[in-house]
Amino acid sequence: MTTAIQEQQNSAAPTAAGRVVRVIGPVVDVEFPRGQQPALFNALHVEVDLEAVAKTITLEVAQHLGDNLVRTVSMAPTDGLVRGAEVKDTGKPISVPVGDVVKGHVFNALGDCLDEPGLGRDGEQWGIHREPPAFDELEGKTEILETGVKVIDLLTPYVKGGKIGLFGGAGVGKTVLIQEMITRIAREFSGTSVFAGVGERTREGTDLFLEMEEMGVLQDTALVFGQMDEPPGVRMRVALSGLTMAEYFRDVQGQDVLLFIDNIFRFTQAGSEVSTLLGRMPSAVGYQPTLADEMGVLQERITSTKGKSITSLQAVYVPADDYTDPAPATTFAHLDATTELDRAIASKGIYPAVNPLTSTSRILEPGIVGEKHYEVAQRVINILQKNKELQDIIAILGMDELSEEDKITVQRARRIERFLGQNFFVAEKFTGIPGSFVPLEETIDAFERICDGEFDAYPEQAFNGLGGLDDVEAAYKKLTDK
């Protein structure tokens, strides 16, 4: 993005008018008078009449073709758009409302409020194309974001101001975990969250809005949606719209913000569609040649500045569970922590279905999390890894053929697996079990005691989907009373 575009964020230049010369699906070519072509990323408006209803279509400039022509991508269906229609240059990029006015409301990628039309248009607005923070503004200190979810805090701790990827195929719990994190941040830290729904189901967006309203966390959250049924231009820009709202809370109000993107794969997918429509040569597996660049433009803006941060939790759909696919592989490069949700663990009824052996965090090292945390985490991972290696022997010969030491390892691993599951606040109405927030110190102590064998006499059922050790003791007492 050029400096000129950065300067246009809040003030429009004198507008020029052009004419539509070609419409191919969501791609619209517009001719302007000589010397009056709009800048790249400028928003253009064109009025259309469809079935006696007037509406304004927003176009975004994507290419300068020469001969006074610009190629644009439509942010709405192009039904009713005809050659010769007048197009007006707004003189600035797509802009969205920012500030407290966006909390508790649902917006689209263009900044239009969906639940209260017209809201925020008379207040401050920021353009969605912005530069990342300068190097000297970045925060150098690394801090853990305590979530109260045992498996995350112990084995894949999140970085405050970092980027976290939730990887998994369809139906393993990515969206549920994001909803849970929104609830925890609002309840435990009174923090502000921004949710960007990128290319997901409209029904899920509606359900999320109603559930957040029911749980009392909606007033601390801004929601921006560009759903499955919308043109690729919208799905490609909605993440930037949500990020812009989050940047205002960080830079102007000095808040720590959580940005949720569901699903970052759909952002890549929309970019691929637009790239093809613009006539670019595809690269590996049919993705756009600018995949790494587009991902970098988004991810580099998500960071900590002096004393405040944007922490991003991004659901990443993995096509056919193939982690070598260019879309998830490109996302990996930007992440500070990865939480992989595993279908095999979900099939055991353990939620969140986090795979502790494949999930990672760059801050799980003694210098950042401390010696005790690191040692306990490594002991847990070693026990689970040893159990995995023994599964083939168990499947062929049975448990009886194992050494006594290996039998103990397998039994402890099974207890650890179940104890890594946890009751969620958002699942209360389905399970009837209240959600739990487990402090990090309690989590470390609990797993250390399990690894030491203090609970070897407890049945595995006593560890299912619970919070801390107090819940385990209560479950054990209940089982023995029977």
Curated annotation (Swiss-Prot):
GO terms for cellular component: plasma membrane; proton-transporting ATP synthase complex. It is an enzyme of class 7 (translocase). One of its GO terms (molecular function) is proton-transporting ATP synthase activity, rotational mechanism. Its EC number is 7.1.2.2. Keywords: ATP synthesis, ATP-binding, Cell membrane, CF(1), Hydrogen ion transport, Ion transport, Membrane, Nucleotide-binding, Translocase, Transport. Belongs to the ATPase alpha/beta chains family. F-type ATPases have 2 components, CF(1) - the catalytic core - and CF(0) - the membrane proton channel. CF(1) has five subunits: alpha(3), beta(3), gamma(1), delta(1), epsilon(1). CF(0) has three main subunits: a(1), b(2) and c(9-12). The alpha and beta chains form an alternating ring which encloses part of the gamma chain. CF(1) is attached to CF(0) by a central stalk formed by the gamma and epsilon chains, while a peripheral stalk is formed by the delta and b chains. This is ATP synthase subunit beta. It comes from Corynebacterium urealyticum (strain ATCC 43042 / DSM 7109). The lineage of its organism: Bacteria, Bacillati, Actinomycetota, Actinomycetes, Mycobacteriales. The gene is atpD.
